[in-house]
Amino acid sequence: MSSGLSLERACAVALGIVASASLVAAGPCDIYSSGGTPCVAAHSTTRALYSAYTGALYQVKRGSDGSTTDIAPLSAGGVADAAIQDSFCANTTCLITIIYDQSGRGNHLTQAPPGGFNGPESNGYDNLASAVGAPVTLNGKKAYGVFMSPGTGYRNNAASGTATGDKAEGMYAVLDGTHYNSACCFDYGNAEVSNTDTGNGHMEAIYYGDNTVWGSGAGSGPWIMADLENGLFSGLSSTNNAGDPSISYRFVTAVVKGEANQWSIRGANAASGSLSTYYSGARPSASGYNPMSKEGAIILGIGGDNSNGAQGTFYEGVMTSGYPSDATENSVQADIVAAKYAIASLTSGPALTVGSSISLQVTTAGYTTRYLAHDGSTVNTQVVSSSSTTALRQQASWTVRTGLANSACLSFESVDTPGSYIRHYNFALLLNANDGTKQFYEDATFCPQAGLNGQGNSIRSWSYPTRYFRHYENVLYVASNGGVQTFDATTSFNDDVSWVVSTGFA
């Protein structure tokens, strides 16, 4: 028996002891450490990734006064204390400003700066994520993931201990398998330190989505692939790997790892079952990927050059030193399954009944005779009463429908123009005919919550959860509480985004 085989068996036995002793006691990074490939970065807004970790998981900043607070686990190794966030963010909006590194290396993720591409915020920075866009439960306890709309990104260009050059590393992420698009590039992992494209092989990151510009897998996607810079790779070929399946899990575990002329993609349902290997073998046959030229920055939600058109949801993920064994990763997957990720409610406040006709009354002082209505494709507010014309009363009435993109939220169909729905486009609200596309469904899905000013409901965009129905100069937008658009002004924001829902005029 070779010494290498003995060591492998010893590690497998040790991992088995860790896993069988208590999945609750051993977090993912404890398991990686036992396997000889310790975490050098560990990020999660939902739970601690070490059994002994009690520090901050993430920081939120509220819109009302700009103050911040850290969210820690309920107990060592436990689930995030979502109640602290809910209390701190009550009656206002909150953004996730920092995702802390639990490894002790200080590899925290913060708002991504501009690079080859500018972000949509001031000075070319990317957007920060809403703190409430991705509620879940872990073992029945509420927590929040990181729901990332196009334009949202986090980064650390001065990371410590991450792989550079052709050095070995591993990584995993737990993602929402139903939240993706085809834009570049929803990534988590190793990237350039300059925010620019410095050539083939300068990245090694998990990618999730259905982009087909470079590589692809079986079916129509989405797929787990690796962003190695100037290519999303599903295997040896720079085009297609039929062994990389389309994913349909609500919660997905995505794994990428790489060492000298060897790399792998693995994946699983994060709520049940075990990991499958979608590719394991030599580096891509295209030039520049053997050896690799990794730079060691860390990105989330964007490409290495700050390409920021993608969308996705991140719950937890780590990066390791060294190439983890399949056995180690299998034990990590068992721990993720034991965390029992499950969906949580996306709505709150007064309930809206699917199939009912409603009208939405402005609550801003001086404008309370106005209701949400439309004039052709323009969604606006108009003065409406029971004595208004039939046409106007119909224009100010909306049929509540199950959310076109997410059945946990709602869509609003025009009473006087059946088949047409309120949707956002360039952050203006429009009335457009349902064209049956994924983009339209996402643009037309909204999640009501308790009104920010204490009255009625505020209606949050599902696809841009920092943004709410807001009347501004009597026209409707999806607006954020502060931002670069004129309609993002903070003045009277809570009132302008709060609506009293009543039985429809028609």
Swiss-Prot record:
Q: Which InterPro entries match?
A: A-L-arabinofuranosidase_B_cat, ABFB, AbfB_ABD, AbfB_ABD_sf, ConA-like_dom_sf
Q: Which residues form the signal peptide?
A: 1-26
- Region Catalytic: what ranges? 27-343
Pathway per its UniProt entry is: Glycan metabolism; L-arabinan degradation
Tell me, which GO biological process terms does this entry list?
arabinan catabolic process; arabinose metabolic process; L-arabinose metabolic process; pectin catabolic process; xylan catabolic process
SUPFAM superfamilies listed in its UniProt record = AbfB domain, Concanavalin A-like lectins/glucanases
Q: How does activity depend on temperature?
A: Optimum temperature is 60 degrees Celsius.
Q: Which positions are annotated as binding substrate?
A: D227, N230, G304, H424, N426, F427, D443, H471, E473, L476, D496
Q: Which reaction does it catalyse?
A: Hydrolysis of terminal non-reducing alpha-L-arabinofuranoside residues in alpha-L-arabinosides
Region annotated ABD, chain positions = 344-506
EC number(s) of the enzyme? 3.2.1.55
Q: Which family is it part of?
A: Belongs to the glycosyl hydrolase 54 family.
Domain remark in the UniProt entry: Organized into two domains: an N-terminal catalytic domain and a C-terminal arabinose-binding domain (ABD).
Q: What does this protein do?
A: Alpha-L-arabinofuranosidase involved in the degradation of arabinoxylan, a major component of plant hemicellulose. Able to hydrolyze 1,5-, 1,3- and 1,2-alpha-linkages not only in L-arabinofuranosyl oligosaccharides, but also in polysaccharides containing terminal non-reducing L-arabinofuranoses in side chains, like L-arabinan, arabinogalactan and arabinoxylan.
Q: What is this protein called?
A: Alpha-L-arabinofuranosidase B
What is the originating organism of this protein?
Aspergillus oryzae (strain ATCC 42149 / RIB 40)
